[in-house]
A protein has these predicted regions:
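Basic, Lys/Arg-enriched alpha-helical interface segments
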Residues: 2-54, 71, 90
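Short hydrophobic/aromatic beta-strand or adjacent loop that forms the aromatic wall/cage
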Residues: 54, 63-65
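Enriched for short, Lys/Arg-rich terminal
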Residues: 65, 69-91
Length: 91
């Protein structure tokens, strides 16, 4: 199954990187690498997660959650959210 990042999700990831990089650029790089590494697992195991219509993937060791949905031929990454943030209305 292919993995597709929506522009919104990439914007969330970019914002998380920029926020962390203000204090520690190396930590920001590590965070993004860790998120990508975990999300790549969705290609083989797309049914991880728990919300009907969407699923959530907690990035261990961070405060981030990746929201995604499984389509016929791809896994669509919808958002990268900090766990302390208010959950968006569309989810």
């Amino acid at each position: 199954m292919r993995l597709y990042w929506t522009p919104i999700a990439m914007g969330h990831l970019r914002a998380a990187y920029e926020y962390v990089a203000r204090e520690n650029a190396a930590a920001a790089e590590t965070l993004v690498e860790q998120i990508f590494a975990v999300v790549e697992r969705l290609e083989q195991y797309p049914r991880m997660g728990r919300v009907e219509g969407t699923r959530e993937l907690v990035i261990a060791g961070t405060a981030f959650v990746v929201v995604y949905r499984v389509e016929a031929e791809r896994v669509e990454v919808l958002a990268v959210l900090h766990a302390a943030r208010k959950w968006p209305e569309e989810f």
